[in-house]
């Protein structure tokens, strides 16, 4: 049981560090009102988690990569906070684009990942 917690925790730490690195890189390259870093992270995360869920990985790898790494990598809470910030700035065009693109492309990415993982 302790091993499972360690697998999830170590995976989450690695995923969070990768998310942070990508976020810093994207924000330094592209200055935009659209939250590009979080969008990229969540779409690639949807694809990768879809792939992992449908692949034949054993339970240890599912815990480490699926629950841990992907849980640390993707960021639902940042997505919601950035959405509220766009609302408060009354930047509704970007807000609704962000919401729509994230949900639509997230579903498409998860579907494609699941199809490739089979």
Swiss-Prot record:
Bilayer disposition of the protein: Multi-pass membrane protein
Superkingdom of origin organism: Bacteria
Subcellular location as annotated: Cell membrane
GO molecular function, one term: fluoride transmembrane transporter activity
Activity regulation remarks: Na(+) is not transported, but it plays an essential structural role and its presence is essential for fluoride channel function.
One GO cellular component term noted in the UniProt record for this chain: plasma membrane
Reactions it catalyzes: fluoride(in) = fluoride(out)
Listed transmembrane segments: 5-25, 47-67, 98-118
GO biological process, one term: fluoride transmembrane transport
Protein keywords: Cell membrane, Ion channel, Ion transport, Membrane, Metal-binding, Sodium, Transmembrane, Transmembrane helix, Transport
Sequence positions that bind Na(+): 71, 74
Family indicated by similarity: Belongs to the fluoride channel Fluc/FEX (TC 1.A.43) family.
Task of the protein: Fluoride-specific ion channel. Important for reducing fluoride concentration in the cell, thus reducing its toxicity.
NCBIfam families: PRK14205.1, PRK14214.1
HAMAP family linked to this entry: FluC (MF_00454)
Name of the protein described by the UniProt record: Fluoride-specific ion channel FluC 1
Organism placement in taxonomy: Bacteria, Bacillati, Bacillota, Bacilli, Bacillales
């Amino acid at each position: 049981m302790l091993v499972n917690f360690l697998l999830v925790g170590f995976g989450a730490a690695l995923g969070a560090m990768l998310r942070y690195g990508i976020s810093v890189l994207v924000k330094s390259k592209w200055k935009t009102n659209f939250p590009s870093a979080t969008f990229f992270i969540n779409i690639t995360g949807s694809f990768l988690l879809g792939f992992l869920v449908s692949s034949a990985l054993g339970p240890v790898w599912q815990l480490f990569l699926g629950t841990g790494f992907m849980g640390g990598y993707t960021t639902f809470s940042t997505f919601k906070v950035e959405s509220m910030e766009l609302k408060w700035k009354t930047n509704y065009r970007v807000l609704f684009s962000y919401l729509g693109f994230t949900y639509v492309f997230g579903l498409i990415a998860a579907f494609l990942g699941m199809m490739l993982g089979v």
